[in-house]
Amino acid sequence: MTARYDRTGPAATITLDRDAKRNAFDTHLANAVRDGILRAEAEGARAVVLRANPTAKIWSAGHDLTEMATHGVEDHDEEPYFRMVMTIRDTPLPVIAAIHAPVLAGGMLVAMVADITVATPAATATMTANRMGVPFRASFYAAMIAVMGLKKAKELMLLAAPLSAEECLNCGLYNHVVAPEALDTTVAAMVARIETLVPEGLAHSKHSLNAIGWAPGLPEHRLARMADEHAAILASPGLTGRVAALLASLKR
């Protein structure tokens, strides 16, 4: 299995279920999460809760490196991970991430793009992209700055060092840090509150806030130059080689 979908009352819960691969997002897992969100919309759910199995040691390690090594490092509108992230962002339903364990790389981006993130003290966050030199789109950097602030975003990207859950709370990546035994009840209380609010109003607020937060606010020529740099790095043999080398080291 890659993800489980459960409907309890007003909330749809999507559980990452790829523990043996540290819940790394391959095509199947990314599509399963996206399909679950679209199903929640179709069923009239009021909120989506995104979580992992309680026994998972890593909430998500981000992109599946095996697929990167096989297909190259892709970043286009139809790439499964990107489509999943955009669906989390663009669904009219509030998405709550319930995080009980460390998040890495693309897993941390999921925590960032979720509308509300509730974590436990064990939920450290590490952005490992620059250990391999994987670039992001301008809109992702804009969102990171909007969520965390410029200085903390630089620390995250330029050091690739883990942030404690408390640091994530203080910089805005997490909304709440609670004891492990309080994670489910805290999320349930949020869902109950969402149920009392007007769906159209919530959708408008979410869309408007994201439209502002994800906007880079740069001239077209600067955005074009950033896009060219981004594409050149993705196409470089060096990046493919670093991904392959990391995979080889993990197999030793």
Segments from the language model and where they lie:
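C-terminal alpha-helix plus adjacent terminal tail
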Residues: 1-9, 40-43, 53-55, 160-166, ...
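Crotonase-fold acyl-CoA enzyme core
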Residues: 3-4, 86-200
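A structural preference for short, pocket-lining loop segments at secondary-structure junctions
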Residues: 9-17, 28-72, 87-97, 116, ...
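Hydrophobic/aromatic residues within transmembrane alpha-helices
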Residues: 14, 50, 64, 110-112, ...
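Glycine- and charged-residue-rich phosphate/anionic-cofactor binding loop of Rossmann-like
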Residues: 22
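Short, conserved glycine- and acidic-residue-centered signature motifs
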Residues: 26-29, 77, 104, 137
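Hydrophobic alpha-helical membrane-association signature
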Residues: 29-32, 80, 226
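Glycine-rich phosphate-binding loop at the start of an alpha helix
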Residues: 62, 78, 82, 105, ...
